[in-house]
Design a protein with these regions (language model features):
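Surface-exposed, Gly/Pro/Thr- and Asp/Glu-enriched linker/hinge segments
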Residues: 31-47, 85, 116, 195-200, ...
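Extracellular/periplasmic solute-recognition and catalytic clefts
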Residues: 37-38, 50-109, 133, 138-139, ...
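Acidic-aromatic pocket-rim loops
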Residues: 89-98, 102-108, 245-312, 401-402
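Extracytoplasmic/peripheral linker and loop segments enriched in polar/acidic and small residues
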Residues: 124, 136-139, 235-245, 274-353, ...
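Structural transition elements
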Residues: 146-191, 210-218, 318
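Long beta-strand-rich cores associated with HINT superfamily self-processing modules
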Residues: 285, 349-394, 405-408, 641
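N-terminal lobe/hinge region of extracytoplasmic solute-binding protein
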Residues: 388-472
């Protein structure tokens, strides 16, 4: 079958912004109106980003006092309304937050206990027990919009599932919800005694975890009242970020540290054709559903959703129409399962001083995108001062393997490392950020021959081995990393292809090396379904990296984004030291669950203790002239020597 080829190159963002303005209906922005940077040197507009923590209730006072230039956490609705129109302050508005309830569906292990949320009909009844209109209009004072599925009204895929959303029949109907709950509880053997459910003579008690920092405290109170009216005994705890996440996401659901939690998700990029959110919020294979794919934990399982999710994620469809049908099927199944009860999309207001120039807001995340603070500056200052609700908490972990799972750390990390590809701030289509790429595909029905000198990482021999004769792939993406490799790391050493190659080998090892997979189970089991589609790699004479994948999409840029194998987040030497610390010395872990299971620290490079461990390991590896065996013998190329 004849394939197609497309070349994508990075465009200066000021130019792309101007072009976007020229193309949008009613837009007046012209190319010469794009903000002029304060200098003509390479790199970001400002010299430094200075981060500091400002509690959300005090943030309006602090930004009025010019203690910061930008607050990267959405203000409470009333505070935003009071601040709007204040001289010297601008509000950057975006539908950047989605709120939901996650239910614990694990069955009770003891015969004299009952978890109501292990019963599907009770989870479904929760859809009618929550008052989304009250949350959107009263709690968020009109700044929220009711949301029934993982797709909010501002998302492009809302049109894909519009009829499912509007035809679901879900509305606030507490009498119906209580009747459905009563029917299911009675069938399970529970009794209603003095308007309270009992099972085996004991009250049916639910543990509700509510976040205390924002409007989710009010949501928790609202949900508690509805649950109590339905006959449940509710024990509510109000936790801040770290304590809540530890209780919910780092424990076995069967331990019942929680039954229901008020989730909140921030968004950092629009998605024209979503694959990540629909899988993360619905399908258990990706590790974001109760059980979190951690070894030894009870797991929520759903083979149908996993099969649909992997099909969508791996591009195993032949048209836009087929893709949309899979997406719709997953959305409908998520409503049937009702593990997450979606509540609202919230318009956040991010205040900034009006002297902050050059900043870009995308359509869903506002200033939470990689262009915003790279382009932002305050005239006459080398610094941009960024405030957030938190900069560090007990659950904030700086490591690129199993950390950066919270918005606060991710907000910093986004400006410490350049992505190769990122979704366009306006269209939601992947575009080059710091790597150019060329896509060639024979999909959806054909295949390409993988060259005989292409290689794949072999976990058993710890070497790059030639791919077997006759290996084929659906698509080929050729990456030009010269915008990275023509520059240095912050410590002055050159960025090289060895940094990317180490990342590729490391990822495969984490997934398939039996001992490493035993230690970091969640990382291993969630990455294998994707790694299975990567067929081989080849370095060209001009240092481009060819990646061969069994993946197709009707939009070539999505093929490019899928095939991006590793990127350049930190020098390979640091990654090697971390691997040694985690897998050889066993003195740290990449993920929270592994750290808990093996009673070692969850590795975070901003903590003096952990940074010291990595530093000492680096020095030891340097003394021994250590080079990871086999990793840098790539085809007929030696990318690193001990010297």
């Amino acid at each position: 079958m004849t394939g197609r080829t497309r070349v994508r190159t990075a465009v200066p963002f000021a130019l792309s912004l101007a072009l976007a303005g020229a193309l949008l209906p009613g837009a007046t922005l012209a190319q010469d109106e794009a903000p002029a940077p304060p200098h003509d040197q390479p790199g970001p507009a400002a010299e430094r980003l200075l981060y500091n923590s400002f509690f959300v209730d005090r943030a309006p006072l602090d930004i009025e006092a010019e203690n910061m230039d930008l607050y990267l956490f959405g203000l409470k609705t009333e505070a935003a309304q009071d601040l709007r129109g204040t001289e010297g302050i601008e509000l950057n508005d975006a539908p950047a937050t989605q709120v939901s309830l996650i239910l614990n569906p694990a069955p009770a292990e003891r015969e004299d206990e009952l978890n109501p949320f292990s019963i599907k009909e009770i989870r479904q009844a929760m859809q009618n027990l929550v008052n989304r209109e009250a949350i959107a209009q009263d709690i968020y004072q009109g700044a929220g919009e009711p949301q029934l599925t993982h797709v909010g009204p501002s998302d492009p895929d809302f049109l894909t599932i519009y009829d499912i959303d509007r035809g679901s029949g879900i509305s606030y109907d507490p009498e119906l919800a209580r009747a459905l709950i009563a029917e299911a509880m009675t069938a399970a053997g529970a009794e209603l005694v003095d308007d309270k459910w009992q099972y085996e003579g004991r009250p049916v008690r639910l543990k509700l975890v509510g976040r205390v920092e924002d409007e989710r405290r009010d949501i928790a109170d609202l949900v508690r009242a509805e649950l109590e009216a339905a006959g449940f005994t509710v024990a509510i705890t109000y936790d801040q970020f770290a304590a809540a996440l530890q209780k919910v996401y780092a424990t076995d659901p069967a331990a019942f540290e929680w039954h229901i939690y008020t989730e909140g998700y921030v968004r950092s990029a629009p998605r024209r054709y979503d694959v990540g959110a629909v899988n993360a919020y619905i399908a258990p294979w990706l590790g974001e559903m109760p059980g979190w794919r951690e070894e030894g934990y009870w797991q929520y399982e759903n083979e149908e959703l996993d099969a649909l999710g992997k099909t969508l994620y791996r591009g195993e469809f032949e048209s836009l129409e087929e893709r949309n049908e899979i997406y719709r099927a997953m959305t409908q199944a998520s409503l049937d399962e009702s593990i997450r009860i979606w509540l609202a999309t919230v318009d956040n207001s991010f205040p900034a001083v009006d002297t902050l120039e050059g900043m870009t807001n995308d359509l869903v995340g506002g200033p939470r995108n990689p262009w915003a603070l790279r382009e932002a500056y305050v005239p006459g200052s080398d610094d941009v001062r960024v405030g957030n609700q938190w900069i560090w908490t007990e659950r904030t972990t700086y490591n690129p393997i199993g950390g950066f799972g919270d918005a606060y750390a991710a907000d910093v990390w986004r400006n410490l490392t350049d992505p190769t590809i990122w979704n366009d701030a306006f269209t939601g289509i992947p575009v080059p950020f710091r790597a150019n790429y060329e896509v060639e595909t024979a999909g959806p029905e054909g295949t390409l021959e993988v060259p005989s000198d292409a290689v794949a990482w072999d976990v058993e021999t710890k070497t790059w081995k030639p791919v077997p004769a006759g290996t084929t792939a659906v698509s080929k993406v050729t990456f030009d990393y010269s915008l990275f490799t023509d520059a240095n790391w912050h410590h002055g050493q050159p960025i090289t292809l060895a940094d990317a190659v180490y990342n590729i080998a490391q990822g495969v090892d984490l997934a398939y090396d039996p001992e490493k997979a035993r230690i970091e189970t969640a990382v291993a089991v969630t990455s294998r379904p994707v790694l299975e589609t990567f067929k081989g790699y080849r370095l060209t004479e001009d240092d481009r990296l060819e990646v061969y994948v069994d993946y197709w999409h009707f939009d070539d840029d999505h093929i490019g984004a899928y095939a991006e194998p590793a990127g350049f987040d930190m020098p390979w030497e640091v990654k090697a030291a971390m691997d040694d610390l985690v897998f050889e010395q066993r003195r740290a872990a990449y993920t929270a669950t592994a750290a808990s299971r093996f009673s070692v620290p969850w590795l975070s490079l901003v903590l003096e203790r952990d940074a010291g461990l990595v530093d000492r390991t680096l020095r030891s590896l340097e003394r021994d002239e250590f080079v990871p065996p086999g990793v840098f013998e790539f085809g007929d190329r030696s990318l690193v020597t001990p010297e």
